[in-house]
Amino acid sequence: MPKYADYLKFIMTLLMAVSMNCFALEAQKSPEKIRIDGLANEVSWQLAKWQPINSLLLGDKPSADDFSGQFKVMWDEQQLYLLVEITDDVLFDQHADPRHLYWDDDCLEIFLDEDASGGNHQFNFNAFAYHVALDNQAVDIGEKNVDGSDNFVLLNDHITSVWRRSEKSPNKVIWEVSVRVYDDNFTMPVKQGMPNQNKVPQPVNLFSGKKLGFMLAYCDNDGSKEREHFIGSIDIKAVKGNKNLGYITADVFSQLTLIDSR
């Protein structure tokens, strides 16, 4: 019986490890500075592997020409680099105010947890849920306003974003993003929506072996009042039927390890 129990324990540990590895990603260090221009013509991108964006988190499953996507991720000491290739037959941005109902417009969503510690981040900066809009502005939810209302903030200092459609059919969207990584000490005033002038937050330096929490997703809307599809890089386990949990908790992020195999 003890041998059987030990064997069962070993199998369970192995299954857990395999399960965790299914959600683990590695990002290769870029040997050059990547220019964010939507062209993706740096040789460095050839060192990174494509990863799918194919897990339905909200809405019904879109057809391949309605939405399909994949991404690559790299890094250097100053930032993460993302190359996202998207098939989207209709690009839609219905709200002029970048902070108003931004999740119902087409946007790229970058989830990032600097120390991979997990936990709630819905109304704080324990982790970030950057919604990068078609106008290349980045929005997240900050601490609540004094009156208790939600506080949607622009974090454009964190993100550099450029996209363009390919001239070749089927005219995919080529979206390049660089992300300066901030830890959970990041703060900003509740009302002004501007970085604290007394102590301007600084991004962390990245290094080989560092682990971050990470997930990528896309909000797709072809002209409806609300988004029609929400597709991510991770198949999140539903809680009470809800998979749209990334903006609430970093516990659902995958683990991204920065490596340098040169």
Can you say where each PLM-predicted feature lies in the sequence?
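Bacterial N-terminal signal peptides that target proteins for export
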Residues: 2-12
